[in-house]
Amino acid sequence: MNILHSTLSTWRDRLAPVSRTSTFRTTGQITPEEFVLAGDYLVYKFPTWAWADASSPAKRVSYLPPGKQFLVTRGVPCHRRLNENFAGDAGHEDEIVRDMLSGADADDGDGWLRTGGGRDLAEKQAERIKDVRTVDESGNMGEREDDEEDIPDMEDDDDDEEAIIREPAGKSTTQPIRTYNLYITYSNFYRTPRLYLSGYLSPSEPLPPHLMMEDIVGDYKDKTVTLEDFPWFDGGLKMASVHPCRHASVMKTLLDRADAALKIRRDKLKQAHSAAEANRINSERGLEGLVDETRGLSLNEQQGHAAGGDEWEVLQHDEEDQVAIRVDQYLVVFLKFIASVTPGIEHDFTMGV
């Protein structure tokens, strides 16, 4: 079934009509030219990412230039699996992430999942009780007290080494570090980026595809993540892929909220009565701060400083029509969203954070 789905998906992308009209602001979709523009920006800002070509000319798509068929970053660490121990809270109730711009009646589709958000406070308190230590009259903290049954017997020091039952290999609670190669491609059918993941247990030992699902948030793993052949490689290399069917709607929501947050900030700046108040407002990063430190690059804001320090940022008339996130910054925001799908993979490692 996966082979059939992968083949149909590849041919659907290659045969779909190519859009040359930008609908970035209205639909969250981008054209192939905008994908290249956003890829160039990602590579420029974060050199761990690079453009790559298909393994052979036959694997190339015509709507992207040779040498820029997809983006790749290699060796991204993944330290922990998404089980009940992940982040201390995984395995418990997930929650939908929203922001203050969403109303009380907002649909779950307006946000995205964050794993392990609903752990009961009483559970945490019960765990803390186990970490009680003693304090002497001088205020010095003592060592953790072992349970009575855990106090060692002095005779144990003479145990025969050969009689000790050791933990079998592979049963250690310390989880081995996995690494991932991440690939961003362009889906011509959905007109959005698409992420593929290829995992490794060691530099020379690929991670079996079904084990990659251990690093995907459960709700996505069950609905939108599939195992497919990577269309740009010969030989049928199987990877996990986040299906792009909802990428455009999620990106549109994020872009709209970033614009709304920027408008609120500008309105506050207009009403500011002092330089100190304006500086405080400027330091508050709303959703337009999704693009890391690129906000200053996108707004082209000018600042005036009088001799007495009474003037602050001046908003030019044409800046009212500017947006919080440009189309060339699209992939940076896209990766912030993807990080919620695979929270165990250190996406910030790829972005020099």
Swiss-Prot record:
Keywords in alphabetical order: Autophagy, Cytoplasm, Protein transport, Transport, Ubl conjugation pathway
Keyword DNA-binding attributed: no
Region spans: Handle region: 249-329
Major place of residence: cytoplasm
Region listing for Disordered, in residue ranges: 135-156
Functional note: E2 conjugating enzyme required for the cytoplasm to vacuole transport (Cvt) and autophagy. Required for selective autophagic degradation of the nucleus (nucleophagy) as well as for mitophagy which contributes to regulate mitochondrial quantity and quality by eliminating the mitochondria to a basal level to fulfill cellular energy requirements and preventing excess ROS production. Responsible for the E2-like covalent binding of phosphatidylethanolamine to the C-terminal Gly of atg8.
Family label: Belongs to the ATG3 family.
Protein name per the record: Autophagy-related protein 3
